[in-house]
């Protein structure tokens, strides 16, 4: 049975006296805003109680050492004292919902956070909160099967990115889920380390270093997330057997996706969109990049003349020593380089992807020949001037995104002045007619005539 109680700072002693007389089951306790620390109310509550915090300011920090729920009414603020974490969960099935949480400490070594879920806080739920201006937003520090869902997490706006914390950090928390959160500012949106069987789905990221940063985290799902205007969208490192699907990188700076020692994973249905971006994004020297000054500040206000720009991401995908992965049905468009593929990466399959309007579709400097088609299905290349006489949807000739001259230009950029020389044109003519002249590299033996079910961004 659930009973409703109302408590102010003057009623804490009365609550403590009433607890032995409480009917079986949890109580729902209304807590008025007060200058008295909330911890006293928490200490007096019984396991299973719901503490419903009224609008106004409630003083932290607070530790939930029993399975309680902090439920905020609209306008309820839980404010820390600038030291340590604002809320620390140490009990199984503890929950924090509907609160504005602010005022953590600033010590990176002690992982000061808006909400910190310890290893003992299994199945903790952190849902529907606004977690604003803390060093770390949410720490799932060993909290198995914990869930962070539907929160707005805003990190520190000022100072160097390297001195900020992450929106959500997951360390050794098998089964933890991070779902449908909005994460802006700070260092990384989600940082996972030494974990497994996690699910990161439906989150939105902006103004960060990495939207998702994965380290030593296996058998997990990264799906349906959106990264906008970050330095790197999705950095997947030292992790195996991942499902990476339905994610978007839109206007990130360096890489849409980065795979470093990531193995045995399926990467499908993702999209990377390159954009012209202000050059200041590359020259901020670690400081936070202010909003594009060309963007109107008031609705209807005319834009100023556009500053110098360059294309970002520089690489839609960077694959470094990543092995036995399958890339299928992804869209890579508008980047300086579609895919930068290193020679140390082996056994990867590429099919059904669309490479659209990248200045260089592929950069591969190895000498081994790689066929980027699988079971008679290759990829779509927007710069492939091909014919399909038999109408089977496949180009009649193989497609090679690079040639010998490209390799020379990567190794000696100054040679660019010779690109239109007669000697270079003769070499390219010979390569086109005598494939044996090619020194190895990427070839798509069954290129697609159109992007299979992948919608390109319309150009103005």
Residue ranges and their predicted role:
Residues 9-20:
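Bacterial N-terminal signal peptides
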Residues 21-26:
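Boundary at the C-terminal end of the N-terminal hydrophobic targeting segment
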Residues 27-57:
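Acidic Gly/Asp/Thr-rich repetitive segments characteristic of extracellular carbohydrate-active
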Residues 39, 43, 47, 58-71, ...:
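Extracellular beta-strand-rich solenoid/capping regions of secreted or surface-exposed proteins
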Residues 52, 63, 71, 79, ...:
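Extracellular beta-strand solenoid repeats
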Residues 80-88, 108-117, 132-140, 160-172, ...:
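Extracellular beta-strand/beta-solenoid scaffold signature
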Residues 271-320, 325-460:
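Functionally critical loop-and-helix segments that line ligand-binding/catalytic clefts
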């Amino acid at each position: 049975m659930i009973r409703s109680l109302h408590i102010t700072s003057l009623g804490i002693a009365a609550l403590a006296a009433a607890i032995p007389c409480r009917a079986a089951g949890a109580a729902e306790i209304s807590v008025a805003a007060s200058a008295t620390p909330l911890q006293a109310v928490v200490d007096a509550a019984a396991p299973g109680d719901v503490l419903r915090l009224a609008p106004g300011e409630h003083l932290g920090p607070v530790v939930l050492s029993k399975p309680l729920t902090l439920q905020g009414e609209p306008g309820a603020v839980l404010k820390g004292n600038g030291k340590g974490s604002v809320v620390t969960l140490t009990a199984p099935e503890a929950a924090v919902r509907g609160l504005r949480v602010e005022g953590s400490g600033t010590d990176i070594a002690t992982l000061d956070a808006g909400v910190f879920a310890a290893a003992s806080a299994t199945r903790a739920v952190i849902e529907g909160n606004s977690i604003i201006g803390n060093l770390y937003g949410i720490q799932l520090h060993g909290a198995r099967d914990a869930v962070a869902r539907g929160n707005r997490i805003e990190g520190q706006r000022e100072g160097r990115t390297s001195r900020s914390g992450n929106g959500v950090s997951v360390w050794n928390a098998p089964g933890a889920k991070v779902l449908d959160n909005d994460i802006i500012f700070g260092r990384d949106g989600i940082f996972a380390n030494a974990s497994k069987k996690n699910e990161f789905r439906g989150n939105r990221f902006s103004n960060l270093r990495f939207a998702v940063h994965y380290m030593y985290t296996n058998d997990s799902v990264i799906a349906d997330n959106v990264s906008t205007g970050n330095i790197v969208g999705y950095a997947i490192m030292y992790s195996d057997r991942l499902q990476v699907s339905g994610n978007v990188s839109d206007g990130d700076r360096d890489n849409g996706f980065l795979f470093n020692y990531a193995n045995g994973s399926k990467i499908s249905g993702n999209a990377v969109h390159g954009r012209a971006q202000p050059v200041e994004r590359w020259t901020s020297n670690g400081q936070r990049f202010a909003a594009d000054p060309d963007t109107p500040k008031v609705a209807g206000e005319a834009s100023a003349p556009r500053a110098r720009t360059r294309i970002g991401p520089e690489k839609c995908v960077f694959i470094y020593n990543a092995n036995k992965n399958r890339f299928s049905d992804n869209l890579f468009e508008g980047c300086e380089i579609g895919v930068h593929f290193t020679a140390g990466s082996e056994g990867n399959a590429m099919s059904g992807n669309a490479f659209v309007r990248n200045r260089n579709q592929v950069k591969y400097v190895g000498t081994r020949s790689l066929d980027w088609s699988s079971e008679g299905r290759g990829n779509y290349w927007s710069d492939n001037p091909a014919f399909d006489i038999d109408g089977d949807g496949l180009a009649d000739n193989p497609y090679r995104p690079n040639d010998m001259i490209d390799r020379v230009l990567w190794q000696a950029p100054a040679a660019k002045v010779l690109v239109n020389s007669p000697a270079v044109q003769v070499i390219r003519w010979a390569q086109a007619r005598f494939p044996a002249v090619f020194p190895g590299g990427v070839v798509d033996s069954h290129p697609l005539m159109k992007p299979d079910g992948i919608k390109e961004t319309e150009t103005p």
